[in-house]
Amino acid sequence: MATSSFPLLSFQEFLTGSEVEKRAVAQKLYNAFHTYGWVYLQDFGISKEEIAEMFAMSKKYFERPLEAKVRDTLNDAETNQGYTPDGAEANGGTDHKEKCFNLSVNVLQALAMVMDLDMNYFSSALAKADPQLRLLYYMPIERSIIESAGHARIIPHTDFGLCTLLFQDNVGGLEVDPFHTGEFVPATPIEGTCVINVADLLQRLSNDRLRSTLHRVTSPPLEKVGSDGMLPARYSTAFFVHPSADVEIDPILRDGEAKKYESVNAGKWRTMNTAKNYANILGPDGVKV
């Protein structure tokens, strides 16, 4: 275990190893997602320097005047692109976005190997995908506000796509409830790792064998809190992986297994859930959700 929350796994042998080594890594990844829904991944093909460049770009963006960022305001549930006051999404450079996409395909192919699916199963499902790279900024705020009832930097939620790749700074505050018991444990930042979690569509597709679990962002460790009681600014970069809009997500069943979910259209699912997250944009039928 990397911390009290979920495992740390090297992805190197899946990328460069033999078939036996690939399958061993794939099984460990599957086991982590089956048990916890989360994993710390290291040796995944994106350098520390490239990640640092992304954070520098994010910091530069959020240092712009508010009026400049407001011009980028998100207002369309289908495109789901733009600035929102508590976070933003931006194209951080084709190279980084493509590397994140390639990593997500490799992660999903590893799962396909264990699930006895065609190795191109997820590649096909992502053929016309529009993943989202989000640069997230959490402003400094009084610790007393965050720790009062009903408050958090991000309230407990699950992600609604296939999976999410998350790169954290060293501030901390991400917490995970892997067993939905109400007991959140820290996903402590580990340098050189990418945190990956299962999202709702992958849970549906696997008929609950892979787990999409609650997570939130709250106060970082006490040593990160200033003497004035202020929480420092926090930056993270999230890459949300969604299937192509025309893909139908229908649970893959094992022999004798009861189907737990009805089929859903990936595009409509995404638009509906995006609209739920933002009060000022429209759902798939042109009305506010």
Enumerate the language-model features and the residues they cover.
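C-terminal flanking tails of non-heme Fe-dependent oxygenases
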Residues: 1-92, 97, 101-103, 108-289
